[in-house]
């Protein structure tokens, strides 16, 4: 299901049901951030799929483990499977085919595997479109959540995400105060307003620190590409300081205190 359709609520309901049945449950997601969100939303420990499968980067262990990409192996595999009655994977759209294969190898027959995700969200960085292909195959029981519930429906971000999926024009009435369009035609004005938003307006009205704010751009090069914007953001948010270490790499300066992704 898409944003605001109740995926997290459904996961919580399933956890409650299986706990009532006395089942052992494992929760996992493809990234650390997604696993952290899953833990916060459910109150149960979730971990990355790599951690669940006990990934190892030690070359000395490779002869004992299933190899999956770049010499890493997994301690959990067909010979040493996961012991659980139910495994719930969130953000399944980000799982690539190699990781999914490793997960399937480590699951015992009879284990319930529940995959949750939004096929229109972030795809996997690695090969394959596992969630989309599984859905298109119709080989497994599948439930699609379509209704946007009241709280999520009050967010213009959620509403516009669904409008875009339906091929409709986005709405800019901004009732929820979380979706803004500022039209600017001058590059220098864009720079100025970007810094104002990050240093003053968003911290004042939303309570976000500059470190909590992420600037996105569809380009790497050019006056509005990430290389130029990063240089400008660094100049204002993390200026040169004799007490901060820095390292130049080509035309880029990496400085202590920079935000790194």
Per-segment meaning from a language model:
Residues 2-175:
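ASCE P-loop NTPase helicase motor core
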Residues 86-90, 216, 261:
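Structural motif
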Residues 119-259:
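Conserved helicase motor core of P-loop NTPases
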């Amino acid at each position: 299901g898409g944003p605001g359709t109740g995926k997290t609520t459904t996961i919580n309901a399933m956890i409650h049901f299986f706990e009532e049945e006395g089942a052992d449950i494992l929760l996992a997601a493809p990234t650390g951030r997604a696993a952290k969100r899953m833990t916060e939303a459910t109150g149960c420990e979730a971990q990355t799929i790599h951690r669940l499968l006990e990934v190892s980067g030690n070359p000395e262990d490779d002869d004992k483990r299933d190899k999956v990409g770049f010499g890493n192996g997994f301690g959990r595999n067909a010979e040493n499977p996961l012991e659980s009655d139910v495994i719930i994977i969130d953000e399944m759209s980000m799982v690539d085919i190699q990781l999914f294969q490793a997960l399937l190898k480590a699951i015992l027959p009879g284990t319930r595997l529940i995959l949750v995700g939004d096929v229109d969200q972030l795809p996997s960085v690695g090969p394959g479109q596992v969630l989309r292909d599984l859905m298109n195959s119709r080989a497994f029981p599948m439930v699609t959540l379509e209704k946007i519930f009241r709280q999520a429906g009050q967010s213009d971000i959620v509403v516009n995400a669904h409008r875009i999926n339906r091929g409709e024009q986005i709405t800019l009435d901004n009732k929820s105060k979380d979706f803004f369009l500022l039209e600017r035609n001058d590059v220098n004005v864009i720079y100025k307003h970007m810094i104002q938003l990050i240093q003053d307006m968003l911290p004042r009205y939303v309570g976000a620190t500059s470190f909590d704010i992420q600037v996105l751009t569809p380009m790497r090069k050019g006056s509005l590409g990430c290389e130029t914007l990063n240089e400008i953001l660094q100049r204002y948010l993390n200026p040169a300081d004799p007490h901060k270490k820095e390292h130049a790499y080509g035309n880029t300066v990496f400085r202590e205190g920079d935000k790194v992704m």
